[in-house]
Amino acid sequence: MKRINLKRIAAAVIAVSSVFAGVYGSTVPSAAEPDEYHDDWLHVNENAEIVDMYGNPVWLTGCNWFGYNVGSQVFDGVWSRNMHEMLTEIADHGFNLLRVPMSTQLLLQWKNNEPDPATPKINEWTNPELTVEGVVGGKVKYSFDVWNQAVKWCRELGIKIMIDIHSAETASAGHQVSLWYTDKYSTEDWYEALEWLTDYYKDDDTLIAIDLKNEPHGKADVPSQMAKWDDSKDPNNWKYAAECAAEKVLAINANLLIMVEGIEVYPKEGYDWTAPAKDWTTNTEFYYGAWWGGNFRGAKENPIDLGEHQSQLVYSPHDYGPLVYEQSWFHEGFTQESIMEEYWYDNWFYLLEEKTAPLLMGEWGGFIDEQHDPDGSNTKWLTCLRDLMIENRIHHTFWCFNENSGDTGGLVYDNFGTWDEDKYALVKPALWKDENGKFISLDHKFAIGANGISLSDYYSGQQPTLPSESIDTLIKGDVNNDKKVNIFDSVALKRFVAGIETDIDKNNADFNSDGNIGISDLIQLNKFLIKY
C-alpha cells in the first residue's frame, strides 16, 4: 500500500470540488478546510477501493455488538460490565469499526423523545458514568443519552461506527422478519428514521456508514414477504427501496457510506419472480438460494444506482458456516476454491473482481471450539473466508463481540468478562495493521486503542509514489490479470472452458503455451497451484 504525505497534497485535494467524475461522482467532502469532526468521511474510487479524503486506501475491519435491536436499550453485557471498559477492549484488540444493530422503532422513539419502554439493561453499580447523578447505584440515564456517551467514547478510542437497521420492530427475533417494513412500521417510517439519524450525526464523522437493512430475505412460498431485486417499483423490491432510502440519506449527508445488503433468492435462467419456489412433482428448483442478505445476482443486470453519489456505495453480503446451516457447498472435502466456484463468485465476489463496488462482509463468525465444532468444518470455513478477505482486502465486521449469540458465540464469554483468545487469534490476521503490527485507525487524529496508530500516523512522512511507465507483463496463469496467480484464476479459467462468458487474459490463460485455451491449461494451472 502506498503511503502519501498528507500535508503536501491536502491543499490540492481540498481545492478540488469533485474527483472521479462520472459514475463515481464527487469523492471530496467539501471545498472548506475540514475540522476534526469532518475529516474522516470515506468514499469509493474508480478501483472500487474505499479511500479517505486524500485518496488513501483504508481497510474497515471491525466487529458487531448488538443489544439496541433486541430491547436492551443498550449494548448487551452492560448489564454486568462497564461499557467504557468493553469499548476500550474492542479498540485495544484492533477493531476499527463497530457495526451496531438498531431498529426503526428505537430510532423513532429517540427522534420523538419518547420514554424508554423499560429501564435500559445497565448495571448502575459498574457504570456510574451512565447514571443521571454520575454515582454508583444512581438512576440510569435515558437510552439515547447513554448511546451518545458511547459515540463520544468510540470517537476518543479511534473506533468508527456503522449503524445497521437490523429490523423494523425492536425484538430479539426481529431479524427473522424478511422485509424492512411490517404492519406496525411502514417503509415511510423507515425513511423517516434514516433521515433523522443522518441529520442528527451529519457533523460527527464518528458515524461513517449506514447499513440500510439487515438481511432482506424471503422465498416464493410467500411472495408478498419475499425481498426481490429487479427494475420494478414494487413495495418488496429491495433494490428500489434501497435506492430511495440512500437518496434521502445522501441528500442530508453526501459523505456517508451506504451499505446495501443482498437478498436470499434470485430466479434461475428462464424464470422470473412469478415462479413458485419449487415444483415438487419434478423436484425442480426455480431460484438460486443464498444466505440471507448474501445474494447479489440481481446486481449484475440491475446494479444499485446512487446517481451523483455512486462514490458512497458499498455492497455488504453476509456469510456463515455449516454450524449455522448445512448449505450444499459445505460438502465433504470443501475448499476455498470449491466454495468460490459453487457459491461466493456468482453471488457476490464478481462485484469485487469486476470493480463494480467494494465489499464489506457485514457478518461472519462462528464457533471454533471442539465442543461445538468437533470435526473442524466450521473453523475450516472461517479460515477460508478470512484468508479470502485478507488477500482481496474485503472490508468486514465480525459477528460478534457478544457472547449471547446462540448459533455463533462471540469474542468474549464468562458474562462478557473473558476474551476467547483462540477465536481472536483466528480473526486477528484480518485486522488492519502496519508492518510493525500496530493496528490502524480510520480516524486521522485518534489512534485505535492503546496498541494502534491514527490514519495520519500511518500515512505521514512518505513521498508520493509516482506511477511508473506501464509495462504489459506476461504472467502465465494470471487468468484474471490481477498480477497474482491463485485459485481465482482457476475459477475464471474453469468458467471460460465451460463456455460461461468470462473476461480473461488469453495470453496468460494459455498455461501450456500451445496456442489454445482448454482443459489441458486448466489441469496444468491446478497442478501448479497445488504444488505452490
Model-predicted segments: where are they?
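Cellulosome-associated attachment modules in secreted, modular CAZymes
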Residues: 21-28, 470-532
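N-terminal carbohydrate-binding accessory modules
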Residues: 25-99, 110-130, 137, 463-471
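Aromatic-lined substrate-binding rim segments of carbohydrate-active enzymes
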Residues: 75-172, 200, 237-254, 374-397
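Surface-exposed intrinsically disordered loops and tails
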Residues: 113-141, 178-185, 225-230, 274-288, ...
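Substrate-binding cleft of secreted/luminal carbohydrate-active enzymes
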Residues: 341-469
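Structural recognition of the beta-strand scaffold that forms the well-ordered cores
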Residues: 58-65, 96-102, 106, 160-167, ...
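Sec-dependent N-terminal signal peptides of Gram-positive bacterial secreted proteins and lipoproteins
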Residues: 3-28
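Extracellular glycoside hydrolase catalytic/binding regions
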Residues: 79, 181, 191-208, 213-394
